[in-house]
Structure formats: C-alpha cells, structure tokens
Amino acid sequence: MKVIFNADDFGLTQGVNNGIVKSHQDGVVKSTTMMVGMDAEQNAIELAHQNPDLKIGVHLRFTAGAPLTEHPNLTNGRTHFVKYSELWNKQDFEAQAVYDEAKAQIDHFLSLGLTLSHLDSHHHAHTHPQILPIVQKLAKEHRVPLRGSGICHQPMTTSYFFTDEFYDQKVSLDGLMQHLLSLKENYDVVEVMCHPAYADQPLIMKSGYALQRELELQVLTSPILKEQLAQHGIAVTDYSALVSTSQVVGV
C-alpha cells in the first residue's frame, strides 16, 4: 500500500507554512494544498519554490476569507464567504458562481508559477452536493486528482481511500499506524488528511484547531513513524500515485 500524507492549509499563516515545510523536510509529508488569497500566501510561495519536491494542490475556499470573485451568492451579501456553520444548510449555491470562484482560485495559483498537483477544499466544502459536480468538472479540465473522488478524467485501475481519522483527539502515532494497517489489505493508495503547524498567534486567532496541529507535527516528523511504515511495507507517496488508479471509496 502507498500512503499520501496531505497537509492542508498551506498559506493560512506562517506558522502553518513552517510546520508543513518541517513535516516535508524531516517527516512524511510529500503533498500539501494551498489556500490562495490568504495572509501568508507570499510566504507560502517563497517556501514552495525553496522546496520543489513538495507537491502542491489548491485547497479551495468557500468558508474562509474573502472570495476572489464578486458573486453575492457565495457570501450571502457579505464581504466574506458564508460561515462553515452555514455551509451545509445553504441549498441555493449558483453553479456559475461556484465555478467562477473555484476557477479564479486555481488560475491565481497557476499564475504564481506553481504546478497544480490536485484539488481539495477547506472544511470539505467541495463535498457539498451543489459544489461537488462543479469541482469534479474543474478537476477533469485540469486533469488532476480530487480528494475523495480520485481521478475524474480517466478510468482508474487500483483502489483509493481518503481518511480524515488523523485529527484532533485521534492524533497519535500508534493510532495512525493501527488505522493504516486496518486499511492495508483493502486499498492500494490511502490519503491521510493532516494539519501540521506551529501554533502562531495568527493561527490561534483564525482557527479553533491550532494547538492540536503541533502534536500532528510531532507525529509526522517522528523517525519511529518512518521506521514503522517501512517495516510494514507502506510507501509514502503523493498524488501522482493516482494517475492510473480506478476504484474509489471515501468522501
């Protein structure tokens, strides 16, 4: 089995950026997704160019910060996106507004001189039933994988599973290994969502999930994790492993 440790929220704060890079340089993270248009974007760009082996996708925003477009449908008439607490009850997303915003974020990412690895979203917003088909369309257009859907633009030949079990109270090295071993016989590629970071003041102000990220960072950079993965024949990879995969289970 191969495992993708994808670090979310690149670009959110410098503490997040530095934690992701640390987990890449000294740990098992080979993949991250960037929130464009956030306060630490420029710092993320600099770190991305300094770490060319770190694969980077777009962490689409529909619940954090301000949109890049001006569709009031995405903000309920405010200056910022709808709140996470409002997302799942909102049933009037306009397809064109969602498409234009997601495309604007992807286009902005590409304008930075970065190569698009894959797509996912903040707060799993892309799994909203009115948003998912639009993001799948964009994944097809850019011929990149989408979290939870795998490859949308061609048939896949091996099984892929996305897990969000490595989060909050479930963060531990032993728990992570037990979870991966429980999946090993059933899937070829597993993506583990993760959020390594240094809990700087901007992160504490922006997110209710801040201090816990430092524990994730400790686990993801532990030499013991690398040893145990190797011992059990689990290879660390990135989303390029999904280029020719087929069967999808997950979000």
Curated annotation (Swiss-Prot):
Keyword Metal-binding (UniProt): yes
CDD domains: YdjC_EF3048_like
EC number: 3.5.1.-
Domain of life: Bacteria
Cofactors named for this entry: Mg(2+)
Keywords associated with the record: Carbohydrate metabolism, Hydrolase, Magnesium, Metal-binding
InterPro entries documented for this protein: COD_ChbG_bac, Glyco_hydro/deAcase_b/a-brl, YdjC-like
GO function terms (MF aspect): deacetylase activity; hydrolase activity, acting on carbon-nitrogen (but not peptide) bonds, in linear amides; metal ion binding
Example GO BP: polysaccharide catabolic process
Principal EC category: hydrolase
Pfam families to which the protein is assigned, alphabetical: YdjC (PF04794)
Binding site for Mg(2+): 59, 122
Record bears the keyword Manganese: no
Protein function: Probably catalyzes the deacetylation of acetylated carbohydrates an important step in the degradation of oligosaccharides.
Homology family: Belongs to the YdjC deacetylase family.
Assembly behavior: Homodimer.
Stated name of the protein: Carbohydrate deacetylase
Gene source species: Vibrio parahaemolyticus serotype O3:K6 (strain RIMD 2210633)
